[in-house]
Amino acid sequence: MKALDFDKYIRVIDDFPKPGISFKDITTLLKDGEAYRAAVDAIVERVRESQPDLIVGPEARGFLLGAPVAYALGIGFVPVRKPGKLPGKTVSETYELEYGSDTLEVHADAIQPGQRIAIVDDLLATGGTTSATARLIEKTGAQVAGMSFLIELGFLEGRKRLEGYEVFSLIKY
């Protein structure tokens, strides 16, 4: 497949969800079969280099990219969910937000000690969710093999929070 200018498939909506925010809408990329496939393929090629045993995707848009990446690599996908969404025993990680805190969970038996885990998500902003996801993975005894994103908002400096990890983003703003 030919290389695409992925940026042109992202719709930018100013002042959403509140004034001063420039929202990057990925639904315009997802609805275009060629662009969606090319984006997933580009992420697959990068993730393949880290030789993961599993892909982890944070709720909810991480599912849209993480699951097809796992499928293409022939490996499993583990969803990282908000509290109360998983029916079995879970492992959790709480992290601080600007105004409060949030918690992420995985099933306790989903990730095994020693496994290499790649995190795939739609967006790297401040790095808070991804950092918490990495801590959650490490809490299970597994290793973070790398992190891949469709979009990175560089001005929010999320990479600084992820120092020590291999980070890849397809589109940078």
Swiss-Prot record:
Oligomer and partners: Homodimer.
* This protein's record includes keyword Hydrolase: no
Gene3D superfamilies associated with the record: 3.40.50.2020
Q: What does this protein do?
A: Catalyzes a salvage reaction resulting in the formation of AMP, that is energically less costly than de novo synthesis.
Write out the GO cellular component annotations: cytoplasm
Matching entries from NCBIfam families are given as:
apt, PRK02304.1-2, PRK02304.1-3, PRK02304.1-5
Q: Name one GO molecular function term.
A: AMP binding
Please report a single Pfam family linked to this protein. Answer: Pribosyltran
What organism does the record attribute this protein to?
Desulfitobacterium hafniense (strain Y51)
Q: Which residues form a coiled coil?
A: none
What's the EC number here? 2.4.2.7
List the catalytic activities from the record: AMP + diphosphate = 5-phospho-alpha-D-ribose 1-diphosphate + adenine
Show the InterPro entries listed in the entry.
Answer: Ade_phspho_trans, PRibTrfase_dom, PRTase-like, UPRTase/APRTase
From its record, what is one biological process in GO terms?
adenine salvage
Its pathway is: Purine metabolism; AMP biosynthesis via salvage pathway; AMP from adenine: step 1/1
Family per UniProt? Belongs to the purine/pyrimidine phosphoribosyltransferase family.
Q: Where in the cell is it found?
A: Cytoplasm
- In Swiss-Prot or TrEMBL terms, this protein is called Adenine phosphoribosyltransferase
Q: Which domain of life is it from?
A: Bacteria
Q: Does the keyword Magnesium apply?
A: no
Sorted UniProt keywords = Cytoplasm, Glycosyltransferase, Purine salvage, Transferase
Q: What class of enzyme is it?
A: transferase
